[in-house]
Structures are given as structure tokens and as C-alpha cells.
Amino acid sequence: AATSAKEMLRQTFDVELTKTRTWLQERRVTFNGDAKLTQLYNTNLFFCMFFSTGITLDTEELVLVTSRSPRYYVSAAYWDRDSLLWSFPAILDADPERAKEMLSYVFGRQRRNFGIHSRYIDGTVLEPGFELDELVAPLLALERYINKTDDKSILSDTDIVQCISLI
């Protein structure tokens, strides 16, 4: 964090602000003629992008979380439903590459406990109990990804093939 802060200072505030605004604008979704819907959608989109995913400090691995907000009672826990049925669709609209990374995490790190109510970010059980929506959420997200991107090559990924047969 300290090194990143020093680099941002070197780049100057104006440069960093311009880069940030450009990044946000490239991912912004517009609904023609409906400013209120555009604002609401993008508020939700960027909340999903910034509060439902994170990069671990130790391995720099993308992880999905129910929320990174400290106001949420299970902050930094993982639920398939929240990550894949609520956050994933918006992120897929704005950043298909990030969405593909999300699927890689889900079908990799989280696969051993598909269907379990909630888990830690390493895939171990947090709160036990089977829930059908938690079980099928990875498949629904995968289908949505393929329909949106037409990237059928993802179906040859070994982790995904194994998970589909497991489910």
C-alpha cells in the first residue's frame, strides 16, 4: 500500500483522477432517455465492482465476497447467490474479463463446497446447510457468461468440466 501511495504521488493527483474517471467512463452503462435508470444502474454496478470482489494481500488472487463493507454482518464471507446472481450480471455487462476471472475463482477455489450456505474466501464452510440457489448459481453465471460473450472455450477448462459433473 505504501509503495502504491508513493507511485500515485509521483503521478500527481490530476493524472490519477483522469485515469480513474476514464476507467469508470469506459465501464459505464447508459440507458438512452432515462437518466435516473442510468444513474441507479451505474451506482449498483460500481458498488458490485468495488465491494463484491477484492484482491488478497498475500497471494494477489481475486476473491469474491458477499460484501467488503464493514457495515455488513458477514463482510468478506462468500455466498454463491450474492456473488453470482446479484453482482456477477452487472460486472459481466461492464467487464467481461473480470467476469471470467470471477468464474475461475468460483469453479476453482469455491468448488469443493458448492451448495453450502456460506463459506470463507478460501472455500471452507462458514455456515453449514444446503441451499439450492447456492448450488445452481455457478451454473447460471456460467450460462450467462457464455450467452453474453460467446466464449465457449471456457467449457474446456478442467475445473469447470469437473464442477459441472459434480453438480
Q: What do the predicted segments below correspond to?
A:
Residues 1-77, 153:
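Acidic/polar, glycine-enriched structural segments that form the non-catalytic walls/loops
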Residues 8-9, 13-16, 73-167:
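Aromatic-rich carbohydrate-recognition surfaces in CAZymes
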